Amino acid sequence: ATYKVTLITPEGKQEFEVPDDVYILDHAAEEVGDLPYSCRAGSCSSCAGKVTAGSVDQSDGSYLDDDQMEAGWVLTCVAYPTSDVTIETHKEEELTA
């Protein structure tokens, strides 16, 4: 399946289709560019965002705990879309505050 992913970035809104077997960050890097990331392995917070609508599968990640994920935090480098989803990007400072 393919889902519509909407990224709310400091530069504005970006929308594109992402297959459910492709990490959102990997696809977004081709479509949007200029998204923050570091390890690309789900073990840091550089690419953190907040899901405001929809859902993702980020079971490959290890950095976030269950409470953070339930609150909507997402690591875009290890997140597959499981529905149409909206994510606010560039949220590392809020997550680590």
UniProtKB/Swiss-Prot annotation:
Looking at the keywords, is Chloroplast present?
yes
Q: Which Gene3D superfamilies match?
A: 3.10.20.30
**Primary localization class, coarse:** plastid
- Compartments (UniProt record): Plastid, Chloroplast
The record's remark on the cofactor is: Binds 1 [2Fe-2S] cluster.
Q: Name one GO molecular function term.
A: metal ion binding
Q: Which GO terms describe its biological process?
A: electron transport chain; ferredoxin metabolic process
The record's section on Pfam families has:
Fer2
What keywords are assigned to this protein?
2Fe-2S, Chloroplast, Electron transport, Iron, Iron-sulfur, Metal-binding, Plastid, Transport
2Fe-2S ferredoxin-type domain: which residues? 3-93
Q: Name one GO cellular component term.
A: chloroplast stroma
In terms of InterPro entries, this protein maps to: 2Fe-2S_ferredoxin-like_sf, 2Fe-2S_ferredoxin-type, 2Fe2S_fd_BS, Beta-grasp_dom_sf, Fd_pln
Highest rank taxon of the organism: Eukaryota
Residues given in the record as [2Fe-2S] cluster binding sites? 39, 44, 47, 77
- What are the TM regions of this chain, as residue ranges? none
What family does this chain come from, according to its entry?
A: Belongs to the 2Fe2S plant-type ferredoxin family.
Primary role: Ferredoxins are iron-sulfur proteins that transfer electrons in a wide variety of metabolic reactions.
Q: Which NCBIfam families match?
A: fdx_plant
Q: What is this protein called?
A: Ferredoxin
